[in-house]
Amino acid sequence: MREETAEQPAPLRSGLTTGSCATATSLAAARLLLCGQVSDAVEIVLPKGKQVQMRLEFCRLVDNFAEAATLKDAGDDPDVTHGALVFARVRLQAAAGVRFLAGAGVGTVTRPGLVLAVGEPAINPVPRRMMTEHLLQLAEEQGYSGGFEVTIGVEGGEALALKTMNPRLGILGGLSILGTSGIVRPFSCAAYIASIHQGIDVATTNGYRHIAACTGNASEDTMRRVYKIPDIALIEMGDFVGAVLKHLRRVSVDKLSVCGGFGKISKLAAGHMDLHSRHSSIDLPQLARWAADVGADAGLQQQILAANTSQQALAMSAAAGVPLGDEVCRHALNFARSIVPASVQVEVFAIDRQGGLVGQAGVDSQREIT
């Protein structure tokens, strides 16, 4: 019999950001205007010096402007913009420099707190710099002393943006043009973590001193019920609680409420800052020890050790009158406090799959939580 060989998964493929797409398409359109050159591909230089070639879907003259488009290729990253058509429309202008406009599918900033001013198109600083550098270099090569008006759009971007954090951040009408390196690293989650930071920045800039970081929809609903907290102060952190806790070292708030499913809160209690199953797991022996600390007898501890899920361990404890949920929240609270500044009041809530509270710590004992 032939020996089995270890499976060797293919390496994940990197992609290119919407900022790279915008740079390539704006350069191709500008080159058509200045040189009369129609391109089916264009080469750009990424911020760290790497040269990449990007294929164009079209490059054409339309009235008094040129436009070009490319399909966003995010590689193996599950990016909402993967496969979207990113386009640039470029007009020549008398004034030197580059003026950016939001086309269809690209959002506009409507709230303070982001790196872009209110009213600006949601084209982030690095993509702006990439486009500006490429366009000014082209102008110098062609002896052109004027400037460029650049409109960036994403086909279907307004609908795609509803699947992102943009509406909550006050970026309305479409997507953001993003990227710091020009490259999308598969499953790096850099964009998601950046949106968490932006959410905190927007909330605090707009005067909210109490934010609630939630793992999902059910925990957000719980925080709305407990505090009637507005959406702008609800931070959709998913599994990235560490992104919230570390950012509060740089951004000041008075109070942080953390709310999530019992299983995820138990991971936080064990000192994990990425709560996804790829990076952390439920520690049943630890749950059994914590249960023992609040009254679980040897029999219940053995049941917890044999449990299939954290929810089952919680249910067993509740049936025995053992407040495992509160104890887990207490440990999660202590860990969170070890990360954020001492000036931040922290509280932790754990919920079941129906959104009911099953544990809490750091909560004002004078206030009834239902």
UniProtKB/Swiss-Prot annotation:
It catalyses: Co-precorrin-5B + S-adenosyl-L-methionine = Co-precorrin-6A + S-adenosyl-L-homocysteine. Its EC number is 2.1.1.195. HAMAP family: CbiD (MF_00787). Belongs to the CbiD family. The gene is cbiD. Keywords: Cobalamin biosynthesis, Methyltransferase, S-adenosyl-L-methionine, Transferase. This is Cobalt-precorrin-5B C(1)-methyltransferase. It is an enzyme of class 2 (transferase). One of its GO terms (biological process) is methylation. One of its GO terms (molecular function) is cobalt-precorrin-5B C1-methyltransferase activity.
